[in-house]
Design a protein with these regions (language model features):
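Extended amphipathic alpha-helical interaction segments
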Residues: 174-271
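Hydrophobic membrane-insertion alpha-helices, especially the h-region
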Residues: 44-64
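N-terminal targeting leaders characterized by basic, low-complexity, disordered sequences
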Residues: 1-25
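Intrinsically disordered, low-complexity segments enriched in small/polar and acidic residues
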Residues: 36, 79-83, 308
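Charged, low-complexity interaction regions
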Residues: 131-136, 233-235, 300
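Juxtamembrane low-complexity tails/linkers enriched in Ser/Thr-Pro and polybasic
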Residues: 24-40
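A cross-kingdom marker for long, charged
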Residues: 69-70, 255-321
């Protein structure tokens, strides 16, 4: 979770982000296509599906920040919060006031309730940064680094959170796509135009941007998923025949999606320049929502095994990878 540059100002409320309704499939154009490995599991789709689930969480953690203030509550600058305090006193104060908005409190509360040792370690990091002169932007950056260090070793627990955990991660992915759509746009041209403007980047990554509420909500959800799966029994990551059939049905349905048809058509052309122009027009948000829509309709058991497969072994990766 990466939060933006330090700034002296405080944030303002942001609207809740609601993902658009799923794409309707009625009346979709019919195309004749060849399907590789038609009689068995499509490994490419499995990798893509698992990637949507796992990367969705990473995308959420990478979102920038905003402070949601309730009523007349005053948010004190961090330098005032820790003024004259020793390290232990600063930890107590920051537990209350580092992120005093509703989403920030919910995240810290979930962490303290489910992982008290990790909560204390995070407060150690925040206290050190605050007493070294860091403002809330600096604290948010520390939370971003800490989040990666927390999530990676807990991926196996998240992988045991079952079909509900699978759907929760898909919801996070849908919200992340909505954030991209609202902030920058979903085609290559729009994304490039957005990132090429330093003012846009500074605004999107600064303390007070629209994504803080989403980021804190996502962090709390990941903490709760890890807590839910921590004591759950292991889930088999071996696909069954019914899983292969369910996934192949989803693959065939996706082939009728407008964005994916455009992607396949562009890849099949011989003209490189024409391919690039076609690819730049593809709406990655619409394509992502189509994939999420299909994945949500997989059978309960398939979701469980797909999540277990997608997280298997990832908890052994270094946190910086």
């Amino acid at each position: 979770m990466s939060f933006g540059k330090r700034g002296a100002g405080e944030g303002h409320p942001a609207r809740s982000l609601l993902p658009p309704p799923p794409i309707e499939e009625a009346g979709a154009p019919v195309a004749r296509m060849k399907v590789a490995n038609a009689g068995g599991i499509d490994k490419g789709f499995i990798a893509l599906a698992a990637g949507v689930v796992i990367v969705s969480a990473g995308a959420a953690l990478a979102a920038p920040s905003v402070l949601d203030m309730f009523g007349s509550q005053q948010v004190r600058p961090i330098e005032i919060v820790v003024a004259g305090l020793d390290r232990n006193q600063a930890k107590v104060a920051l537990a209350r006031e580092a992120f005093p908005d509703g989403e920030g409190r919910a995240f810290m509360s979930a962490l303290q309730t489910n992982f008290p040792t990790d909560h204390d370690r995070l407060l150690d990091v925040l206290a050190d940064e605050a007493m070294d002169g860091g403002d809330r932007d600096a604290l948010l950056q520390e939370v971003g680094r800490w989040s990666v260090e927390f999530v990676v070793p807990n991926l196996s627990a998240i992988g045991r959170s079952g079909a509900d955990g699978f759907d929760e991660l898909l919801n996070i992915g849908g919200d992340a796509l909505a954030m991209v759509e609202k902030t920058a746009g979903c085609t290559a041209d729009k994304l490039e135009a957005f990132v090429s403007n330093p003012t846009n980047l500074a605004s999107a990554m600064s303390y007070g941007s629209d994504s803080y509420k989403f980021s804190m909500q996502t962090s709390a959800k990941l903490v709760n998923l890890a807590a839910r799966g921590r004591g759950a029994p292991p889930v088999s990551a071996e696909f069954r025949r019914e899983d292969e059939q369910a996934v192949m049905t989803a693959v065939m349905g996706l082939m009728m999606d407008e964005q994916i048809m455009g992607l396949m058509s562009a890849n099949g052309r011989g003209n490189f320049e024409g391919n690039q122009q076609a690819l730049r027009k593809i709406d990655i948000c619409k394509m992502g929502r189509s994939i999420i829509y299909k994945l949500k309709r997989l059978p309960f058991g398939t979701k469980e095994r797909m999540l277990a497969m997608g997280t298997q072994g990832l908890d052994k990766m270094p946190a910086g990878v």
